[in-house]
């Protein structure tokens, strides 16, 4: 007769039901590890300001769309401008929150050789890069929305000739 301790049954991690881990077939796959490792916050060799710039560009760019299409001005002629202004306001709030996090989390001297993103100066650079990148991403998205017909005609001419 089989015992309840056979490996075919679900067992607690290391035999202790009060200790857990978050290892799943999805989170432990090579694809997931490579994908997460290539995100700018984890990519080796980037300075904090470049990390913030890349994260900010993505966030500024993709936040304009929901504000434009779902915001209170969605049915008006100035929906794109309303989306841009709302995005700028949200980016300002996010930048203030990032700055506050850096002020309370990285107080005092940082040890030599510490990860630059885990120091007060590094986090400040990350926050500055985030702000500049998010503003730039929002303006680019606004420009593309305002000139959609032009961009569409360029791509139609390029690919349908």
UniProtKB/Swiss-Prot annotation:
Entry keyword Transmembrane helix: yes
Cross-referenced PANTHER family: PHOTOSYSTEM I REACTION CENTER SUBUNIT XI, CHLOROPLASTIC (PTHR34803:SF2)
Compartments where located: Cellular thylakoid membrane
Family: Belongs to the PsaL family.
SUPFAM superfamilies associated with the record: Photosystem I reaction center subunit XI, PsaL (SSF81568)
Database matches in Pfam families: PsaL (PF02605)
Spans traversing the lipid bilayer: 84-104, 126-146
A GO BP entry: photosynthesis
Name of the featured protein: Photosystem I reaction center subunit XI
Cellular component GO terms held in the UniProt record: photosystem I reaction center; plasma membrane-derived thylakoid membrane
Membrane topology classification: Multi-pass membrane protein
Domain of life: Bacteria
Keyword annotations from UniProtKB, A to Z: Membrane, Photosynthesis, Photosystem I, Thylakoid, Transmembrane, Transmembrane helix
Lineage: Bacteria, Bacillati, Cyanobacteriota, Cyanophyceae, Oscillatoriophycideae
Originating gene: psaL
Primary localization class, coarse: membrane
Database matches in InterPro entries: PSI_PsaL (IPR003757), PSI_PsaL_sf (IPR036592), PSI_suXI (IPR022980)
